[in-house]
Amino acid sequence: MNVENEYLELLKSWCDGLIRLQFQKEDNPRLDGGIFCPSCMMIHGRCHDAIYPMMYLADRLKEKKYLEAAKLLFQWSGNLLCDDGSYYNDAQNDWMGITVFSVIALTHALEFHASLLTAQEKEKWEARLNRTAEWVFQTITPQFDVNINYHAACAEAMALTGMYFHREKYLKRSDEMADFCMQYISKEGLFFGEGKPRDDVSPKGCRPVDIGYNVEESLASLLSYGTIRKNKIVRDKVKHMLWVHLEFMNPDGGWDNTMGTRNYKWSYWGSRTSDGCQLAYGLLGDEEPVFSDASYRNFKLYKRCTHDGLLYGGIDYYEHGELPCVHHTFCKAKALALLLDFGAVSVTPSELPSEHLDSVKYWPVIDTYRIARGGFIATV
C-alpha cells in the first residue's frame, strides 16, 4: 500500500467511526448531526470541525454518507452559534475563542469541495463563514488576552478568509497577527506564550512553552499564513522553529511534552484538541526530507492508537478499557484531509534528531534537560 492510500484508509476509518456516533433521524434539532463522545458522554461543541474531512471523503470517494454527515454537522452547529457570530465551545462552556478553528475548517471545506453543495447550500455556508470570520476579525487582536495559539490561528484564519472573500482588511489583520507572533520566539528557537500572562517570565527565567500546541497548531497555522501570504520571513522562521521542536519527537513518532505548560492535554502522539503535527511537518516534507519522515512516524503512531475507527489517547488506552474522546479523532482528521487535498503525503526515510541526541542538552527557557543514555531518553 502506498503512503497516500495509507492516509486515505485511516481517514476513512476515522470518519466512519465518527458517523457511527453521529445522531441522525432523531427528529430533534438539538441532537441531529451532533457526534456523541463515548468518553465524555456528551456532544463536543467543536465536532462540527469534522465538516471538512467529511467533505473531502465525499468528494474523493463519491459516497453520499459523508456529504450527508457534513450537512448534518453544519445544521447541528447552529445550536452553538451566537448572535455576534461566535460559537460556544460546548453547550456547558461559553468560551468562544474556538470560533477561529471552525472558520479555518469551514473555509477549507468550501475552498476545496464547495462543488458538492447546491447553490442555496453554498450561499448558506458562506453566510455562516462570513459571520464567524467577522467575529474573529473584531475579537482576536494582539490585545486579546489568551494563549498565543489563538493569535497564530487568527493569522491563518484571516489569510484564508481574506483570500476567499477578497477582503483586504482580513489580509492586513493576518499580517498583523503573524508579526505579533514572531515576537514570541525564544533564543533557543522555541515558540512561547502558552500561558497567562503570555509574556510572563518565571523566577528561573522560564517562558510558557507547550511543545504539543506548538507543533500541532501554532506553527502549522503560521506556516499556512506564510504560504498564503508569500511571507518568506515568517515561513523561514517557522521552519527553523520546527527543526528546534523536532528534538522533542521520540523515535516512534510520539512527542515528549512532559514539561509543557498545557501538558494536561498531552496524549503522547500530540495534544488532545489540536489538529496534529502532520500539517506543519507534512506540508514541508518536500523541502526537508526529515520532516516527511517525522510526519509519517507520527501518522503510524495514530494507526497504532486507532481502534474501531477512533483515535485513543495513547498506546495502552484501548487495552486498559479507557474509552476514547472523539476530540482526538475529528481534530486529527482535519490534518489528514488537508495533507491529502494538497497531495503532501510522501515520505523519505530519515534519521530524527532524537536518534542522535547529545548525551545531555539543557533548554534554559523551560529549565529542562534532555538526557540520552543507552537507548533511553529522559526529560528532567
Language-model segment annotations:
Residues 1-3, 48-64, 101-120, 153-168, ...:
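Well-ordered alpha-helical scaffold segments within catalytic/enzyme domains
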Residues 75, 79, 88, 92-139:
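Well-ordered mid-protein domain cores that form the structural environment of catalytic cofactors
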Residues 232-235, 247-380:
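Extended polysaccharide-engagement surfaces of secreted carbohydrate-active enzymes
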Residues 1-46, 56, 60, 64-75, ...:
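Low-complexity, Ser/Thr/Pro/Gly-enriched N-terminal "stalk/linker" regions
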Residues 20-48, 83-100, 137-152, 188-217, ...:
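Solvent-exposed loop and edge beta-strand segments that line ligand/cofactor-binding
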Residues 119-198, 211, 228, 235-242:
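Eukaryote-skewed repeat-based solenoidal scaffolds used as protein-protein interaction platforms
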Residues 22, 61, 81, 113, ...:
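Alpha-helical junction/boundary sensor with strong preference for TPR arrays
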